[in-house]
């Protein structure tokens, strides 16, 4: 639920952008891609270098293009959303957006953003963050999700394996979202 809500809030911060880059293709991005496609937008998915499985997943959800996060898309983007907690992606996203484009930092935390040349911001590009969502965001998303319809891909882990789940998440080995379930629930299933 959180991934969909914060993803939706991040997408709304891009305004009416038609070509949207998504950096970090995990829980939020796989939901945002479905919503954006429903809205008639094009998604350009950026993953860790060499993550062909993640890129294939993005394309299977309707992304117009998928590639490594350190490469430029085939055309300039109107906006980009960064879900990966990697500050070094901000300058890369700024290079990928056109004049007047917006880069939205949509995660709850991020490493430091490195120094960048002013020319990346010049021509009215902007960077913003998402800290919270509003009640209205939630109402809009929950009304929209069944119309899309949003289909989530999840990988479940027993609660006793929470550390392993975090390791998989950090290393980019989760397709969609990781979900922790009580161990006794798995024994009954």
Which role fits each region the language model picked out?
Residues 7, 36, 58, 93, ...:
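Residue-level signal for nonpolar/aromatic packing positions in well-ordered secondary structure
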Residues 28, 32, 54, 92-93, ...:
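Aromatic/hydrophobic pocket-lining residues that form π-stacking "cages" and hydrophobic walls in ligand
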Residues 14-17, 44, 52-126, 187-189:
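Glycine-rich cofactor phosphate-binding loops and adjacent beta1-alpha1 units
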Residues 5, 27, 50-53, 87-88, ...:
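Short alpha-helical
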Residues 106-110, 130-133, 157:
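Short strand-turn motif at the edge of the Rossmann-like AdoMet-binding core
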Residues 1-70:
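Mid-domain Rossmann-like dinucleotide-binding core that forms the NAD(H)/NADP(H) cofactor-binding site
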Residues 24, 47, 84, 107, ...:
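Short beta-strand/turn micro-motifs composed of small residues
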Residues 91, 135-189:
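C-terminal hydrophobic helical "lid"/dimerization subdomain
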């Amino acid at each position: 639920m959180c991934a969909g809500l914060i993803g939706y809030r991040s997408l709304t911060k891009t305004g009416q952008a038609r070509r949207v880059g998504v950096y970090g293709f995990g829980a939020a991005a796989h939901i945002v891609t479905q919503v954006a496609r429903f809205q008639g937008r094009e998604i350009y998915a950026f993953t860790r270098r060499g993550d062909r499985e993640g890129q294939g997943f993005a394309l299977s959800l309707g992304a117009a293009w998928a590639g490594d996060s350190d490469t430029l898309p085939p055309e300039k983007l109107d906006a980009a959303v960064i879900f990966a907690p990697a500050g070094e992606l901000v300058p890369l996203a700024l290079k990928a957006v056109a004049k007047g484009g917006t880069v939205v930092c949509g995660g709850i935390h991020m490493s430091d953003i490195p120094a960048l040349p002013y020319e990346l911001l010049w021509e009215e590009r902007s960077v913003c963050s998402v800290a919270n969502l509003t009640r209205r965001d939630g109402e809009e998303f929950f009304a929209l999700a069944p119309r899309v319809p949003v289909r989530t891909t999840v990988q479940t882990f027993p609660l006793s394996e929470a550390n392993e789940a975090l390791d998989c998440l950090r290393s980019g080995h989760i397709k969609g979202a990781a979900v922790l379930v009580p161990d006794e629930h798995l024994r009954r299933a």
